[in-house]
């Protein structure tokens, strides 16, 4: 049963999206266009279309570190998500399960931690517009689903 579901309305001029499902948050590094996640499970858009990401293992670089390693996920793009976001209408919504806070797990040798952020912050940083509604549904079984638009300053990386 899902309560307090957020629907992100996509507003992306390149019609490209990065969809990330995670259990725990890790630092985001947009210089190398990588998302750090602990476990990616489901990516669901309206119509129950599922997409998977390629995952590669990453080990902590700190010498003598007991970090078991984490998963490294390259920034993914779906071009296009639909033939046209204009004509897709409600189908361009992505369903996410809202949580009030996101646990962060970061190795001690890393300088920055990803603090819990609100979806308002995400919408501002990643150029998304959204609205919130309350909904109840037993049709989905998923963890945190986040839809991220490609930031303007990384667009050049996707032209190569």
From Swiss-Prot:
Record localization: Membrane
Keyword tags: Membrane, Transmembrane, Transmembrane helix
Keyword Membrane attached: yes
Membrane-topology descriptor: Single-pass membrane protein
Membrane keyword on record: yes
Main localization of the protein described in the UniProt heading: membrane
Cellular component aspect of the GO annotation: membrane
Tree of life domain: Eukaryota
Ranges annotated as spanning the membrane: 24-44
Stated family: Belongs to the TMEM191 family.
Protein name: Transmembrane protein 191A
Native source species: Homo sapiens
Gene, per the UniProt record: TMEM191A
């Amino acid at each position: 049963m899902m309560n307090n579901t957020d629907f992100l309305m996509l507003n992306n001029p390149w019609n490209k999206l990065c969809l990330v499902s995670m259990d725990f948050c890790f630092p985001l590094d947009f210089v190398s266009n990588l998302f750090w996640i602990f476990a990616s499970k489901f990516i669901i858009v309206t119509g129950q279309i599922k997409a998977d990401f390629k995952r590669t293992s990453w080990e902590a670089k700190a010498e003598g570190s007991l970090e078991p390693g984490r998963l490294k996920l390259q920034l993914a793009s779906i071009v296009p998500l639909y033939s046209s976001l204009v004509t897709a209408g409600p189908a361009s919504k992505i369903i996410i399960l809202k949580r009030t806070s996101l646990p962060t797990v970061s190795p001690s040798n890393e300088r920055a931690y990803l603090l819990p952020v609100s979806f308002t912050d995400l919408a501002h940083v990643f150029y998304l517009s959204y609205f919130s509604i309350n909904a109840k549904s037993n049709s989905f079984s998923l963890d945190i689903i986040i839809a991220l638009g490609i930031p303007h300053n990384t667009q050049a990386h996707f032209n190569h």
